[in-house]
Amino acid sequence: MTQSYASHARALMVLGLPIIGSHLAQMALHVSDTILLGRYGVTELAVGVIGGTGFFVVFILGSGFAQAVMPLVAAAVGRNDEVQVRRYARMGMWLSLAFGLMTYPLFWVSESWLLGLGQKPEVARLGQDFLRIAGWGMVPALLVMALKSYLAALGRTQVVLWTTIGAVGVNFVIAYALIFGVWGMPEMGVRGAAIASLSVQAGTFVVLAVYAGWLPELRHFHLFQRFWRPDWQALGQVFRLGWPIGVTGLMEAGLFSAVSVMMGWIGTVELASHGIAMQAAALAFMVHLGLSNAVTVRTGLAEGAGDARALRDGAKVAIAMSVAFGLVMVALFLAFPVAILSLFLDMAKPESAQIVAYGTVLLALAALFQLGDAMQVIALGLLRGIRDTRVPMWAAAFSYWVVGIPVSYVLAFRFDLGGVGLWLGLVVGLAVAAGMLMWRFWLRAPRVV
Protein backbone atom coordinates (compact mmCIF):
# COMPACT_ATOMS: atom_id res chain seq x y z
CA MET A 1 0.00 0.00 0.00
CA THR A 2 1.34 3.42 -0.99
CA GLN A 3 2.17 5.65 1.97
CA SER A 4 1.34 9.35 2.02
CA TYR A 5 4.03 11.96 2.55
CA ALA A 6 2.46 12.69 5.95
CA SER A 7 2.82 9.06 7.03
CA HIS A 8 6.47 9.10 5.95
CA ALA A 9 7.00 12.27 8.00
CA ARG A 10 5.34 10.71 11.07
CA ALA A 11 7.44 7.56 10.78
CA LEU A 12 10.63 9.61 10.47
CA MET A 13 9.68 11.68 13.52
CA VAL A 14 8.85 8.63 15.65
CA LEU A 15 12.15 7.01 14.72
CA GLY A 16 14.26 10.16 14.51
CA LEU A 17 13.31 12.22 17.58
CA PRO A 18 14.77 9.75 20.12
CA ILE A 19 17.93 9.47 18.00
CA ILE A 20 18.24 13.27 17.90
CA GLY A 21 17.74 13.37 21.67
CA SER A 22 20.43 10.74 22.20
CA HIS A 23 22.89 12.71 20.04
CA LEU A 24 22.20 15.86 22.08
CA ALA A 25 22.60 13.89 25.31
CA GLN A 26 25.93 12.53 24.08
CA MET A 27 27.06 16.11 23.46
CA ALA A 28 25.96 17.03 26.98
CA LEU A 29 28.12 14.21 28.37
CA HIS A 30 31.25 15.61 26.71
CA VAL A 31 30.37 19.19 27.69
CA SER A 32 29.94 18.17 31.35
CA ASP A 33 33.42 16.58 31.35
CA THR A 34 34.86 19.77 29.87
CA ILE A 35 33.15 21.93 32.51
CA LEU A 36 34.39 19.75 35.40
CA LEU A 37 37.98 19.62 34.15
CA GLY A 38 37.90 23.36 33.43
CA ARG A 39 36.97 24.00 37.05
CA TYR A 40 39.72 21.66 38.27
CA GLY A 41 42.62 23.24 36.36
CA VAL A 42 43.78 24.72 33.05
CA THR A 43 46.33 21.96 32.38
CA GLU A 44 43.76 19.28 33.16
CA LEU A 45 41.28 20.95 30.82
CA ALA A 46 43.88 20.94 28.04
CA VAL A 47 44.56 17.25 28.73
CA GLY A 48 40.85 16.46 28.60
CA VAL A 49 40.44 18.32 25.31
CA ILE A 50 43.49 16.83 23.54
CA GLY A 51 42.97 13.36 25.02
CA GLY A 52 39.26 13.39 24.22
CA THR A 53 40.03 14.52 20.67
CA GLY A 54 42.53 11.69 20.20
CA PHE A 55 40.02 9.14 21.48
CA PHE A 56 37.25 10.60 19.30
CA VAL A 57 39.33 10.49 16.09
CA VAL A 58 40.08 6.78 16.60
CA PHE A 59 36.46 6.13 17.56
CA ILE A 60 35.15 7.84 14.41
CA LEU A 61 37.33 5.62 12.22
CA GLY A 62 36.25 2.43 14.01
CA SER A 63 32.58 3.32 14.25
CA GLY A 64 32.03 2.65 10.55
CA PHE A 65 31.57 -1.08 11.22
CA ALA A 66 28.98 -0.36 13.90
CA GLN A 67 27.16 2.12 11.66
CA ALA A 68 27.08 -0.43 8.83
CA VAL A 69 24.90 -2.64 11.04
CA MET A 70 22.01 -0.17 10.72
CA PRO A 71 21.27 -0.38 6.96
CA LEU A 72 22.12 -4.09 6.74
CA VAL A 73 19.80 -5.04 9.60
CA ALA A 74 17.08 -2.71 8.29
CA ALA A 75 17.22 -4.35 4.85
CA ALA A 76 17.09 -7.81 6.46
CA VAL A 77 14.03 -6.74 8.46
CA GLY A 78 12.46 -5.49 5.22
CA ARG A 79 13.02 -8.97 3.74
CA ASN A 80 11.73 -10.68 6.95
CA ASP A 81 15.10 -12.45 7.23
CA GLU A 82 15.60 -12.93 10.98
CA VAL A 83 18.72 -15.05 10.54
CA GLN A 84 20.58 -12.26 8.72
CA VAL A 85 19.37 -9.70 11.28
CA ARG A 86 21.36 -11.37 14.05
CA ARG A 87 24.30 -12.30 11.81
CA TYR A 88 24.87 -8.72 10.66
CA ALA A 89 24.61 -7.42 14.23
CA ARG A 90 26.99 -10.07 15.57
CA MET A 91 29.60 -9.51 12.87
CA GLY A 92 29.35 -5.75 13.43
CA MET A 93 30.17 -6.39 17.08
CA TRP A 94 33.00 -8.76 16.12
CA LEU A 95 34.64 -6.10 13.94
CA SER A 96 34.07 -3.41 16.58
CA LEU A 97 35.70 -5.61 19.21
CA ALA A 98 38.68 -6.38 16.97
CA PHE A 99 39.21 -2.72 16.05
CA GLY A 100 38.98 -1.59 19.68
CA LEU A 101 41.57 -4.14 20.84
CA MET A 102 43.96 -3.34 17.97
CA THR A 103 43.95 0.39 18.71
CA TYR A 104 44.77 0.13 22.42
CA PRO A 105 48.59 0.08 21.89
CA LEU A 106 48.22 3.51 20.28
CA PHE A 107 46.81 4.87 23.54
CA TRP A 108 49.47 3.11 25.64
CA VAL A 109 52.28 5.07 23.91
CA SER A 110 50.28 8.28 23.47
CA GLU A 111 52.86 10.50 25.22
CA SER A 112 55.21 10.09 22.25
CA TRP A 113 52.70 11.13 19.60
CA LEU A 114 51.26 13.91 21.75
CA LEU A 115 54.79 15.35 22.01
CA GLY A 116 55.13 14.91 18.25
CA LEU A 117 51.97 16.98 17.81
CA GLY A 118 53.64 19.82 19.70
CA GLN A 119 51.97 19.42 23.10
CA LYS A 120 53.78 20.57 26.23
CA PRO A 121 55.56 17.77 28.16
CA GLU A 122 53.20 17.98 31.15
CA VAL A 123 50.12 17.84 28.91
CA ALA A 124 51.59 14.89 26.98
CA ARG A 125 52.44 13.00 30.18
CA LEU A 126 49.01 13.52 31.73
CA GLY A 127 47.41 12.85 28.34
CA GLN A 128 49.00 9.41 28.30
CA ASP A 129 47.74 8.74 31.83
CA PHE A 130 44.25 9.74 30.65
CA LEU A 131 44.32 7.67 27.45
CA ARG A 132 45.78 4.55 29.06
CA ILE A 133 42.61 4.39 31.15
CA ALA A 134 40.08 5.85 28.72
CA GLY A 135 41.49 3.72 25.87
CA TRP A 136 40.03 0.59 27.47
CA GLY A 137 36.67 2.21 26.81
CA MET A 138 37.11 1.98 23.03
CA VAL A 139 35.79 -1.59 22.95
CA PRO A 140 32.58 -0.96 24.94
CA ALA A 141 32.06 2.39 23.16
CA LEU A 142 32.14 0.71 19.74
CA LEU A 143 29.99 -2.19 20.95
CA VAL A 144 27.47 0.34 22.26
CA MET A 145 27.42 1.98 18.83
CA ALA A 146 26.79 -1.40 17.18
CA LEU A 147 23.92 -2.17 19.57
CA LYS A 148 22.44 1.30 19.04
CA SER A 149 22.52 0.70 15.27
CA TYR A 150 20.89 -2.72 15.72
CA LEU A 151 18.14 -1.35 17.97
CA ALA A 152 17.52 1.67 15.72
CA ALA A 153 17.09 -0.63 12.72
CA LEU A 154 14.45 -2.52 14.73
CA GLY A 155 12.71 0.76 15.63
CA ARG A 156 13.79 0.57 19.30
CA THR A 157 15.16 4.10 19.58
CA GLN A 158 13.48 5.06 22.88
CA VAL A 159 15.80 2.80 24.87
CA VAL A 160 18.79 4.39 23.13
CA LEU A 161 17.60 7.84 24.22
CA TRP A 162 16.91 6.99 27.86
CA THR A 163 20.09 4.97 28.25
CA THR A 164 22.15 7.88 26.91
CA ILE A 165 20.39 10.36 29.21
CA GLY A 166 21.05 8.06 32.15
CA ALA A 167 24.70 7.79 31.12
CA VAL A 168 25.04 11.60 31.22
CA GLY A 169 23.85 11.73 34.84
CA VAL A 170 25.93 8.77 36.02
CA ASN A 171 29.03 10.10 34.26
CA PHE A 172 28.65 13.51 35.89
CA VAL A 173 28.36 12.02 39.38
CA ILE A 174 31.32 9.62 39.00
CA ALA A 175 33.50 12.21 37.25
CA TYR A 176 32.76 14.88 39.87
CA ALA A 177 33.54 12.47 42.72
CA LEU A 178 36.79 11.19 41.23
CA ILE A 179 38.11 14.42 39.71
CA PHE A 180 37.70 16.47 42.90
CA GLY A 181 37.88 13.68 45.49
CA VAL A 182 34.54 14.22 47.21
CA TRP A 183 32.17 11.81 49.01
CA GLY A 184 35.11 9.79 50.30
CA MET A 185 36.59 9.19 46.84
CA PRO A 186 40.30 9.82 46.04
CA GLU A 187 41.16 13.03 44.14
CA MET A 188 42.34 11.78 40.74
CA GLY A 189 42.02 14.73 38.34
CA VAL A 190 42.11 13.66 34.69
CA ARG A 191 42.44 10.00 35.68
CA GLY A 192 39.11 10.32 37.47
CA ALA A 193 37.50 11.65 34.30
CA ALA A 194 38.92 8.70 32.35
CA ILE A 195 37.64 6.17 34.91
CA ALA A 196 34.19 7.77 34.80
CA SER A 197 34.14 7.58 31.00
CA LEU A 198 35.26 3.94 30.98
CA SER A 199 32.73 2.98 33.67
CA VAL A 200 29.82 4.62 31.88
CA GLN A 201 30.71 3.08 28.51
CA ALA A 202 30.95 -0.39 30.06
CA GLY A 203 27.70 0.11 31.98
CA THR A 204 25.87 1.37 28.90
CA PHE A 205 26.98 -1.70 26.96
CA VAL A 206 25.68 -4.03 29.68
CA VAL A 207 22.28 -2.26 29.77
CA LEU A 208 21.82 -2.31 25.99
CA ALA A 209 23.10 -5.89 25.68
CA VAL A 210 20.61 -7.11 28.28
CA TYR A 211 17.80 -5.20 26.56
CA ALA A 212 18.72 -6.39 23.06
CA GLY A 213 19.35 -9.99 24.05
CA TRP A 214 16.64 -10.73 26.55
CA LEU A 215 13.69 -8.40 26.00
CA PRO A 216 10.74 -10.74 25.20
CA GLU A 217 9.87 -8.84 21.99
CA LEU A 218 13.47 -9.16 20.71
CA ARG A 219 14.45 -12.54 22.13
CA HIS A 220 13.40 -14.38 18.97
CA PHE A 221 16.38 -12.84 17.12
CA HIS A 222 18.74 -14.84 19.42
CA LEU A 223 21.37 -12.10 19.17
CA PHE A 224 23.87 -13.62 21.61
CA GLN A 225 23.10 -17.29 21.02
CA ARG A 226 26.32 -18.95 19.73
CA PHE A 227 27.86 -15.49 19.50
CA TRP A 228 31.31 -17.04 18.94
CA ARG A 229 30.29 -18.66 15.65
CA PRO A 230 31.59 -16.71 12.64
CA ASP A 231 29.59 -15.92 9.53
CA TRP A 232 32.27 -14.95 7.05
CA GLN A 233 29.85 -13.77 4.37
CA ALA A 234 28.06 -11.41 6.78
CA LEU A 235 31.38 -10.26 8.23
CA GLY A 236 32.62 -9.42 4.74
CA GLN A 237 29.48 -7.43 3.98
CA VAL A 238 29.74 -5.44 7.21
CA PHE A 239 33.44 -4.81 6.60
CA ARG A 240 33.00 -3.68 2.98
CA LEU A 241 30.13 -1.37 3.87
CA GLY A 242 31.65 -0.13 7.12
CA TRP A 243 35.23 0.89 6.43
CA PRO A 244 34.27 3.64 3.93
CA ILE A 245 31.78 5.00 6.50
CA GLY A 246 34.57 5.28 9.07
CA VAL A 247 36.95 6.93 6.63
CA THR A 248 34.26 9.40 5.52
CA GLY A 249 33.61 10.40 9.14
CA LEU A 250 37.34 10.78 9.75
CA MET A 251 37.75 13.05 6.74
CA GLU A 252 34.83 15.26 7.79
CA ALA A 253 36.24 15.54 11.31
CA GLY A 254 39.60 16.37 9.72
CA LEU A 255 38.04 19.20 7.71
CA PHE A 256 36.69 20.94 10.80
CA SER A 257 39.86 20.23 12.79
CA ALA A 258 42.04 21.73 10.05
CA VAL A 259 39.92 24.88 9.99
CA SER A 260 40.20 25.13 13.79
CA VAL A 261 44.00 24.85 13.58
CA MET A 262 44.16 27.55 10.90
CA MET A 263 41.85 29.77 12.97
CA GLY A 264 44.39 29.48 15.79
CA TRP A 265 47.02 30.95 13.47
CA ILE A 266 44.88 34.09 13.14
CA GLY A 267 44.35 34.90 16.83
CA THR A 268 43.00 33.90 20.22
CA VAL A 269 39.79 35.94 20.01
CA GLU A 270 39.08 34.56 16.55
CA LEU A 271 39.67 31.00 17.75
CA ALA A 272 37.38 31.51 20.75
CA SER A 273 34.66 32.98 18.51
CA HIS A 274 35.10 30.09 16.09
CA GLY A 275 34.75 27.54 18.89
CA ILE A 276 31.53 29.05 20.20
CA ALA A 277 29.95 29.52 16.77
CA MET A 278 30.90 25.95 15.90
CA GLN A 279 29.24 24.68 19.10
CA ALA A 280 26.02 26.45 18.13
CA ALA A 281 26.21 24.99 14.62
CA ALA A 282 26.95 21.53 16.05
CA LEU A 283 23.82 21.63 18.21
CA ALA A 284 21.72 22.33 15.12
CA PHE A 285 23.61 19.64 13.18
CA MET A 286 22.54 16.99 15.70
CA VAL A 287 18.97 17.30 14.37
CA HIS A 288 20.11 16.67 10.79
CA LEU A 289 22.33 13.79 11.95
CA GLY A 290 19.40 12.18 13.78
CA LEU A 291 17.23 12.52 10.68
CA SER A 292 20.06 11.02 8.63
CA ASN A 293 20.19 7.97 10.92
CA ALA A 294 16.41 7.61 10.75
CA VAL A 295 16.34 7.86 6.98
CA THR A 296 19.08 5.21 6.74
CA VAL A 297 16.76 2.82 8.57
CA ARG A 298 13.67 3.78 6.57
CA THR A 299 15.56 3.53 3.27
CA GLY A 300 17.04 0.17 4.27
CA LEU A 301 13.59 -1.19 5.17
CA ALA A 302 12.13 -0.03 1.85
CA GLU A 303 15.10 -1.37 -0.11
CA GLY A 304 14.87 -4.74 1.64
CA ALA A 305 11.14 -4.92 0.91
CA GLY A 306 11.71 -3.95 -2.74
CA ASP A 307 9.45 -0.88 -2.37
CA ALA A 308 11.00 1.74 -4.66
CA ARG A 309 8.06 4.13 -4.24
CA ALA A 310 8.40 4.19 -0.44
CA LEU A 311 12.16 4.60 -0.73
CA ARG A 312 12.01 7.61 -3.04
CA ASP A 313 9.04 9.26 -1.30
CA GLY A 314 10.70 8.79 2.09
CA ALA A 315 13.85 10.41 0.74
CA LYS A 316 11.90 13.45 -0.49
CA VAL A 317 10.21 13.84 2.90
CA ALA A 318 13.51 13.57 4.80
CA ILE A 319 15.10 16.19 2.56
CA ALA A 320 12.11 18.53 3.00
CA MET A 321 12.15 18.12 6.79
CA SER A 322 15.88 18.80 6.97
CA VAL A 323 15.58 21.88 4.75
CA ALA A 324 12.69 23.20 6.84
CA PHE A 325 14.64 22.85 10.08
CA GLY A 326 17.72 24.31 8.41
CA LEU A 327 15.78 27.40 7.35
CA VAL A 328 14.53 27.87 10.92
CA MET A 329 18.13 27.74 12.20
CA VAL A 330 19.26 30.15 9.47
CA ALA A 331 16.62 32.62 10.67
CA LEU A 332 17.66 32.19 14.34
CA PHE A 333 21.38 32.58 13.61
CA LEU A 334 20.73 35.76 11.60
CA ALA A 335 18.13 37.26 13.96
CA PHE A 336 19.61 36.49 17.39
CA PRO A 337 23.39 36.08 17.11
CA VAL A 338 24.23 38.03 20.28
CA ALA A 339 21.71 36.10 22.39
CA ILE A 340 23.05 32.77 21.08
CA LEU A 341 26.71 33.66 21.65
CA SER A 342 25.98 35.06 25.11
CA LEU A 343 24.83 31.62 26.26
CA PHE A 344 28.46 30.46 26.05
CA LEU A 345 30.15 33.51 27.63
CA ASP A 346 30.47 35.47 30.85
CA MET A 347 29.51 38.87 29.43
CA ALA A 348 31.05 40.62 32.46
CA LYS A 349 34.53 39.77 31.17
CA PRO A 350 36.08 42.45 28.93
CA GLU A 351 37.14 40.07 26.14
CA SER A 352 33.56 38.80 25.70
CA ALA A 353 32.51 41.85 23.68
CA GLN A 354 35.23 41.15 21.08
CA ILE A 355 34.29 37.49 20.89
CA VAL A 356 30.60 38.35 20.38
CA ALA A 357 31.41 40.91 17.68
CA TYR A 358 33.50 38.44 15.69
CA GLY A 359 31.23 35.51 16.48
CA THR A 360 28.24 37.39 15.04
CA VAL A 361 29.93 37.38 11.63
CA LEU A 362 30.76 33.68 11.93
CA LEU A 363 27.18 32.81 12.89
CA ALA A 364 26.00 34.52 9.71
CA LEU A 365 28.35 32.22 7.79
CA ALA A 366 27.12 29.27 9.88
CA ALA A 367 23.66 30.14 8.59
CA LEU A 368 25.07 29.84 5.07
CA PHE A 369 26.57 26.40 5.54
CA GLN A 370 23.59 25.04 7.54
CA LEU A 371 21.75 23.88 4.45
CA GLY A 372 24.83 22.46 2.72
CA ASP A 373 25.83 20.57 5.86
CA ALA A 374 22.27 19.31 6.30
CA MET A 375 21.97 18.09 2.71
CA GLN A 376 25.31 16.29 2.68
CA VAL A 377 24.58 14.36 5.89
CA ILE A 378 21.05 13.46 4.72
CA ALA A 379 22.49 12.29 1.39
CA LEU A 380 25.04 10.14 3.23
CA GLY A 381 22.21 8.60 5.27
CA LEU A 382 20.21 7.85 2.14
CA LEU A 383 23.20 6.31 0.37
CA ARG A 384 23.99 4.10 3.37
CA GLY A 385 20.38 2.93 3.30
CA ILE A 386 20.94 1.56 -0.21
CA ARG A 387 24.37 0.23 0.88
CA ASP A 388 26.41 2.63 -1.25
CA THR A 389 29.42 3.89 0.73
CA ARG A 390 32.62 3.62 -1.31
CA VAL A 391 31.95 6.20 -4.05
CA PRO A 392 30.40 8.60 -1.48
CA MET A 393 33.64 8.30 0.50
CA TRP A 394 35.65 9.53 -2.49
CA ALA A 395 33.12 12.28 -3.21
CA ALA A 396 33.37 13.45 0.41
CA ALA A 397 37.18 13.29 0.30
CA PHE A 398 37.22 15.46 -2.82
CA SER A 399 34.73 17.96 -1.39
CA TYR A 400 36.38 18.30 2.03
CA TRP A 401 40.09 18.08 1.21
CA VAL A 402 40.47 19.06 -2.45
CA VAL A 403 37.86 21.86 -2.35
CA GLY A 404 37.05 22.88 1.24
CA ILE A 405 40.46 23.12 2.92
CA PRO A 406 42.34 24.73 -0.04
CA VAL A 407 39.55 27.29 -0.55
CA SER A 408 39.60 28.08 3.18
CA TYR A 409 43.37 28.58 3.16
CA VAL A 410 43.45 30.71 0.00
CA LEU A 411 40.58 32.98 1.07
CA ALA A 412 41.94 33.37 4.61
CA PHE A 413 45.64 33.90 3.93
CA ARG A 414 46.02 34.86 0.27
CA PHE A 415 42.98 37.15 0.02
CA ASP A 416 43.39 38.29 3.67
CA LEU A 417 39.81 37.45 4.66
CA GLY A 418 40.98 35.80 7.89
CA GLY A 419 38.42 33.74 9.77
CA VAL A 420 35.66 34.77 7.37
CA GLY A 421 37.67 33.19 4.55
CA LEU A 422 38.09 29.98 6.53
CA TRP A 423 34.34 29.69 7.05
CA LEU A 424 33.59 30.55 3.42
CA GLY A 425 35.79 27.58 2.52
CA LEU A 426 33.60 25.41 4.75
CA VAL A 427 30.51 26.73 2.97
CA VAL A 428 31.96 25.88 -0.45
CA GLY A 429 33.26 22.43 0.57
CA LEU A 430 30.00 21.37 2.20
CA ALA A 431 27.93 22.70 -0.72
CA VAL A 432 30.02 20.69 -3.20
CA ALA A 433 29.64 17.59 -1.01
CA ALA A 434 25.88 18.08 -0.81
CA GLY A 435 25.56 18.43 -4.58
CA MET A 436 27.72 15.43 -5.43
CA LEU A 437 26.18 13.12 -2.83
CA MET A 438 22.58 14.04 -3.65
CA TRP A 439 23.28 13.50 -7.34
CA ARG A 440 24.77 10.09 -6.49
CA PHE A 441 21.72 9.06 -4.47
CA TRP A 442 19.13 9.96 -7.09
CA LEU A 443 21.29 8.25 -9.71
CA ARG A 444 21.44 5.01 -7.67
CA ALA A 445 17.99 4.98 -6.04
CA PRO A 446 15.69 2.24 -7.41
CA ARG A 447 13.23 3.42 -10.06
CA VAL A 448 9.48 3.15 -9.66
CA VAL A 449 8.05 0.85 -12.34
Question: Model-derived features: where do they sit?
Answer:
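Small-residue hotspots at the loop-to-helix junctions and early N-terminal turns
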Residues: 42-53, 127, 131, 194, ...
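Helix-terminus/linker motif at the lipid-water interface of multi-pass membrane proteins
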Residues: 24-47, 115-121, 177-188, 250-283, ...
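Structural signal for membrane-spanning alpha-helices in multi-pass inner-membrane proteins
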Residues: 107, 149, 175, 179, ...
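Short alpha-helical transmembrane segments in multi-pass integral membrane proteins
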Residues: 1-16, 73-139, 170, 186-243, ...
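Short runs within selected transmembrane alpha-helices of multi-pass transporters and secretion channels
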Residues: 66, 134-152, 160-168, 193-209, ...
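N-terminal transmembrane alpha-helices
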Residues: 3-35, 39-40, 53-68, 72, ...
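Small-residue-rich hydrophobic transmembrane alpha-helices
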Residues: 47-104, 108, 141-160, 273-336, ...
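Transmembrane helical elements of multi-pass membrane transporters/channels
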Residues: 14-33, 133, 144, 167, ...
